[in-house]
Amino acid sequence: MLTNNELMEQFYFPDEAPAIPEFLSNDTFQQLEQLMYQQEFSTSDSQSDGANSCSLEMYYDTPSVLELEHMLNAQEQQQHHLQANPLGKNQGRSPRYWNKQQRSKPYDKLSTSMSSSTSSASSSSSSSAGFGGEVLKKRRLAANARERRRMNSLNDAFDKLRDVVPSLGHDRRLSKYETLQMAQAYIGDLVTLLSRDY
């Protein structure tokens, strides 16, 4: 399982460019890239609006948008790499990638704080794993015993109710639902009987 730091490193600094999905063609990537450019121009035009510019900037700086831009950059790099040198590895990064890297710094700070808290929690949990396992086992056994007692007392109460409620035939045992329905009808009949004037 990857920690947050490893995930961020894998996301922002992959060992090699990710493979292009088979269902996406070059035209699709070009359309996505044009859409990204249009969004960048629309955000730069709307930055004069004051409050709207802040919300748009935060919207376009989300990790999903950055991931899409990274995928587009990786696809471009793969195309240039395959055209220029089909056997070597791609070592460079486009300038747009580094611009997006600087825009994503708030997420880096968030991920480092989250990863430090998860690493401290994992270290404390690994030290108390032996002791915690026994405690959890005892708690689980106690909870199972309580649930068994509760179900037994509930079944006993239904058995007593079946003995009191008149049923149509004694050839089969009434289900819990049928027992409750019969008890409701029986109580209703008793109430009407008691409310009569003699």
Curated annotation (Swiss-Prot):
Q: What is its main location?
A: nucleus
What Pfam families does the database record attribute to this sequence? HLH
Q: Where in the cell is it found?
A: Nucleus
Q: Mind listing the GO biological process terms from this record? A: axon development; dendrite morphogenesis; neuron fate commitment; positive regulation of transcription by RNA polymerase II; sensory organ boundary specification; sensory organ development; sensory organ precursor cell fate determination
Cross-referenced PROSITE patterns, in alphabetical order?
BHLH
Which GO molecular function entries does the Swiss-Prot or TrEMBL record give?
DNA-binding transcription factor activity, RNA polymerase II-specific; E-box binding; protein heterodimerization activity
Q: Which GO terms describe its cellular component?
A: nucleus
InterPro entries, A to Z: bHLH_dom, bHLH_transcription_factors, HLH_DNA-bd_sf
- Please state what the protein is called: Basic helix-loop-helix transcription factor amos
Which species is this UniProt entry from?
Drosophila melanogaster
Q: Which gene encodes it?
A: amos
